[in-house]
Every structure is written in C-alpha cells, then in structure tokens.
Amino acid sequence: MDLSATNHRIPLGDGNSIPIIGLGTYSEPKTTPKGSCATSVKIAIDTGYRHIDGAYIYQNEHEVGETFREKIAEGKVRREDIFYCGKLWATNHDPVMVRPTLERTLKVLKLDYIDLYIIEIPMAFKPGDVVYPRDENGKWLYHKTNLCATWEALEACKDAGLVKSLGVSNFNRQQLELLLNKPGLKHKPVCNQVECHPYFTQPKLLKFCQQHDIIIVAYSPLGTCRNPMWVNTSLPPLLKDTLLNSLGKKYKKTAAQIVLRFNVQRGVVVIPKSFNPERIKENFQIFDFSLTEEEMKDIEALNKNVRYVELLMWRDHPEYPFNDEY
C-alpha cells in the first residue's frame, strides 16, 4: 500500500474511498472550552488531514461545519477533498427517526451530504432527545432493537443522496452477519468502527471484515483517556510500552506514531482524537517510514485481548456487543 501525506485514501466496498487517517473530535461538552474543536479541525486541515470523525452527540458539529466552510472559502480544500463521518446515536434507531436525525446533522454542519454515516452502537435506547435516558432510579431505559429496520432507513438516506457511504460501529460478528444476510440488502456496511490498537489487535474481527470487504476504523488507536466512566483504568497505558518506545527511538518517532503506523500498515483506518496542536501534527507524521515485517509481528504479539472501552454500564442490554468472542 503506497500511502503518502498527500495521497492516503483507501477504497471502500461501495466504490467510494476513505482517508486512512482522520481526526477524532470526541469531547465532553461540559468540560471542553468552546472553539476547541474548530481550532483543532483548522490545524488538522492545514496539516494535511482530510478525514474528520464526529457525531451529533459530541455537540460540536457546528464548529466542524464552520471550519469546513472557512477552509473551502480560503481555497485550502474543496468539499470533495473532505471526508466527514457522522453517527446515528442509540436514541434514534427507530426507522422513522433515522432520516430526520441525519438531516439535523446536515443542518448543523450546513452540508448537503456527508461522506459516511454509521450506527454508533448496536444497542437502542428509549427514543427521544435525552441522549442517556434513565428512569428516576437511575436505571437505563432501553428500547427494542431492530438493526435491520434501522439499516433499511439508512439505505433510503443513501438513495436520497444525503450520505455517500454507510457503516456501523461497535458491532460484533453476529450483528454484522445480521445485516449482511438481511433479505433485500441494498447497501452493505463499508466499515466497522471499533477499538483497535497493539493491546487489542482484533485479529478475528479484522479477518472477518476483510473477507466481507468491510474496513476496520480504529477508535482509541492510541489506547485512550483515563476517564473511569468509559475506561478500564486497570490496564497499563499503551504509550508507555517498552517495545513501542524502543521502536520509536530506532525510527526517531514517538510511541504514538509507531502505534498509528502499525494499524495503517494493516489497512486499518485510524482516527486519533486530539485537541492539542502539536499532537495533531505529530500524529499525521506517519507516512515517511515503515515498520518491517518482523516489527509488525512483534507489535502484534503485544495483544492482550483486553478492551479499554468496555461499555460495561450497558452490559445487560440484549444487544450488548462485547459478550461474544468477536
């Protein structure tokens, strides 16, 4: 795979293509200063990123859209150069809500279409505007999940030209097979966005997806933040790993750059999230070196098969995806 800083798109199963590195824009709305996302997207585009990964529930899509318009007006990029991924949240799985939810994202971004729209998690929650619905006792309010019906509503959005490609996130093999075997399937999922890094290499899921022309997009490709609400903090931080740091010394790179290069060489798309200008630039500097076959095997051997992001608060949901082996 001959990838460079200016040419790093890889083909998707529907004939479209995706840049192999993107900027993740996840943020905690309550604690993230206004404008942080816009500044980060500007720096990313100026650095050479063309893929931005976002979601309506991050509450910063308006900043992403403003930055796109600004950079297009400057002549830095054209709309067709930019690849934006949005997400359908768990409270909007009801088929009648799918198109209005996507249209709301388009309105906030002020775009005519987005490049990729994915089901964020395979678990449905009580429909409505409350993102994390619970009852008065704090119990999560779940909703009957019908992934095939949700998918049909997404297919109609693609047919209407609102989105170029459709995908999923946090799906296990069984949930992917449910869609792939759906009677009358019009559009296959082009990607499955999942946690993937040297401590959690996902070999079986990766192989299954490759067999079905589904790209793996790696979230938390550098390990993750240490927020105990989301994260298994008993795991050691990935970027402190001895092997990754010794390879970093060899190539005059950081452990983070080694980790990103590892996944890119496996054909896995990476979307490291950062609002730190230096790290945004650093994460992109992965096209001027390659790891040897031996080094790739050594990094693969670091796999502990343990997730940082377990979503344990929803493990009693009938569609909780992480009980299966993969």
Swiss-Prot record:
Short name of any one Pfam family annotated for the protein: Aldo_ket_red
NADP keyword on record: yes
Activation/inhibition comment: Subject to inhibition by high substrate concentrations. Inhibited by testosterone concentrations above 10 uM. Inhibited by the primary and secondary bile acids chenodeoxycholic acid and ursodeoxycholic acid.
A GO MF label: Delta4-3-oxosteroid 5beta-reductase activity
Keyword Ribosomal protein: no
SUPFAM superfamilies, alphabetized: NAD(P)-linked oxidoreductase
Gene Ontology biological-process annotations: bile acid biosynthetic process; bile acid catabolic process; lipid catabolic process
Keywords (A to Z) from UniProt: Bile acid catabolism, Cytoplasm, Lipid degradation, Lipid metabolism, NADP, Oxidoreductase, Steroid metabolism
Superkingdom assignment: Eukaryota
Binding of NADP(+), residues: 22-26, 53, 169-170, 193, 219-224, 273-283
Cellular component annotations (GO), alphabetically ordered: cytoplasm
Matching PANTHER family: ALDO/KETO REDUCTASE
Function of the molecule: Catalyzes the stereospecific NADPH-dependent reduction of the C4-C5 double bond of bile acid intermediates and steroid hormones carrying a delta(4)-3-one structure to yield an A/B cis-ring junction. This cis-configuration is crucial for bile acid biosynthesis and plays important roles in steroid metabolism. Capable of reducing a broad range of delta-(4)-3-ketosteroids from C18 (such as, 17beta-hydroxyestr-4-en-3-one) to C27 (such as, 7alpha-hydroxycholest-4-en-3-one).
Protein name (database record): Aldo-keto reductase family 1 member D1
Species in which this protein is naturally found: Oryctolagus cuniculus
